[in-house]
């Protein structure tokens, strides 16, 4: 069978399928969740997805073939993940729960923000009167060895995100 087929990056097809199944379990959990006996709204689904992603601990002693791809991250139990990996994982999970989300690469003329990625999520939720695009940076909110995950950078308005990134020391 496919168990012995290895992809170019050295991961077997079986491990890719296993990772996709794990991601689908998360998506099914979110899609089937209820609050006060009602299905979750789009915002509530997104916040739950964000919580799943931010529970991984950032590891900057990265392996470029592991820390950026969803299947590799999930097969390493999140032990190897960097900003692009967080953005990719959030983007894939959001797509599975019906929320538009894309990876966004930060770059500017000074290259101060080069080599950082986050996600752009579009939320339309009548329950909370939300309709717009938001920057989401699960890397900055990720769990750390000394603290739990937080949710400060989960839904930044575009103009607020610009202010925050200008004040960051990313060196």
Q: What are the residue ranges of the model-derived segments?
A:
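Catalytic cysteine-centered active-site loop
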Residues: 60-72, 77-80, 97-112
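Active-site nucleophilic cysteine motif
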Residues: 42-49, 79-94
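Secondary-structure boundary elements
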Residues: 9-76, 130
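Flexible, glycine- and charge-enriched loops at secondary-structure boundaries
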Residues: 39, 80, 149
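Intrinsically disordered, low-complexity repeat and linker tracts
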Residues: 1-23, 83, 89, 140, ...
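Residue-level recognition of well-ordered secondary-structure positions
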Residues: 50, 54, 84, 95, ...
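Hydrophobic/aromatic-rich core segments of domains that either
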Residues: 85-163
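Short, flexible coil/linker elements and helix-boundary hinge sites characteristic
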Residues: 1, 10, 33-37, 98, ...
